[in-house]
Amino acid sequence: MAKPRAARRPASVYALAGIRLFNGVTGLLMPTVLIRRLDPDRDLSPAAVYAFRLFGIRTILLGLDLLTNRGQRLQEDLREGVLIHGSDTATAALLGIRGQLPPRTAALTTLISAVNTALAASAADFGKRKGK
């Protein structure tokens, strides 16, 4: 008996999953790479290493969810992605506004997070239309 074919996901879901997997693996296995990109002029903080590893594994799992979940669970994941990445965008922008990140770093992290937010919104919109 043949299995029913799974519905195809939009490119935005695959792009967002890829970004999450890349960032998650980097955060988990090579947190110093990400820390140095954010704050190249300071000594490494053990707390920053911990935080990147902590969120690294969570980010990997969120990426895998986009590739493996289906139906209502996938739609929930897509809606949650807008909140997750929107929060990241606001955080990056605030760090820049407050001068807690160098201007170039703040602009780049805000832009990257905004692209992720747009991908999440696009995917969530697709999921909403497919669910109707």
Residue ranges and their predicted role:
Residues 1-132:
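Short amphipathic, positively biased membrane-proximal segments
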